[in-house]
Amino acid sequence: MSLQVQPQVSLKPFNTFGVDVRAQLFAEAHSDADVREALAYASAHDVPLLVIGGGSNLLLTADIPALVLRMASRGIRVISDDGNRVVIEAEAGEPWHPFVQHTLAQGFSGLENLSLIPGTVGAAPMQNIGAYGVEIKDVFAGLTALDRQTGELRDFSLEECRFAYRDSVFKQQPGRWLILRVRFALNRVAHLHLEYGPVRQRLTEQGIEQPTPTDVSRAICSIRSEKLPDPAVLGNAGSFFKNPLVSAAVVAQIKAQHPDLVAYAQPDGQMKLAAGWLIERAGWKGFREADAGVHKLQALVLVNYGAATGLQLLDLAQRIQKDIAERFNVELEMEPNRY
């Protein structure tokens, strides 16, 4: 057996909140064979299997009575290249930001707006990660996943993934699909997305009038570094709440009290609000209780100042949800998966 299964392993190094809970069993998968072995092991020992990636979208509230399998497979390869459009495939365990930097170094554009997002390649399609006007669905060329119900491999097209805002079929059917590798359609001729004001502004400040994809990536990295704390320094899971979608009527109600509210019209007629703005306006920015808090610079980020438990962070999140619902009649949804 090549899979190394260890009992009673602390998951503190494997979640970016730095919450110290234990896995009943723990293993790392470096290949498809390891994944199948883990499935067989969990079945034979009658324990659940919980698959994790970089741990940047996890809130762990108790010890995990399961085999926790961390995807650690590596590998990046070009699948097709017609001179401009390049399809590149990466294994699920590849760290996301270094993968983005690799594609840029090869002269491929498309992922630059998704720079410095924590996590792994395999986790990216789960919630259709997005930033600065680009989502995974915009560069998606397919993926291969293992059906945990049948043990069969299946290739997914864009349509089959059912991507939506921070959502996908993989999130809608938790525990069924185990993503093994993902393919992206990138280009040598750049089509830059500079719709977001802060990105254009940063490039202008740097005196860059005709930016390259690498310039855009660097600008976004500098913006994100200023706004978001480094999980290696201060435990966090990035944006903790989704930006809520509400009706025009709700927007009108809030604007009556808060004329400076900014709302973004969506194709389906709904309006998207900035969750961070709502939380800050409600007075939570910089709040701290024991070691659980709201970041002092970015109200959308909950932080662990050292010894916060998952339950303390969850309690804080739920209090914020309750307050925002009562103040603004808006329901905030948590982004991290909770266990």
Curated annotation (Swiss-Prot):
Signal peptide coordinates: none
Keyword Chloroplast: no
Superkingdom as given in the UniProt entry: Bacteria
SUPFAM superfamilies attached to this UniProt entry: FAD-binding/transporter-associated domain-like, Uridine diphospho-N-Acetylenolpyruvylglucosamine reductase, MurB, C-terminal domain
Cell wall biogenesis/degradation as UniProt keyword: yes
Protein known as: UDP-N-acetylenolpyruvoylglucosamine reductase
Catalytic reaction(s) noted: UDP-N-acetyl-alpha-D-muramate + NADP(+) = UDP-N-acetyl-3-O-(1-carboxyvinyl)-alpha-D-glucosamine + NADPH + H(+)
GO CC, alphabetical: cytosol
PANTHER family for the chain: UDP-N-ACETYLENOLPYRUVOYLGLUCOSAMINE REDUCTASE (PTHR21071:SF4)
EC number: 1.3.1.98
Chain's gene name: murB
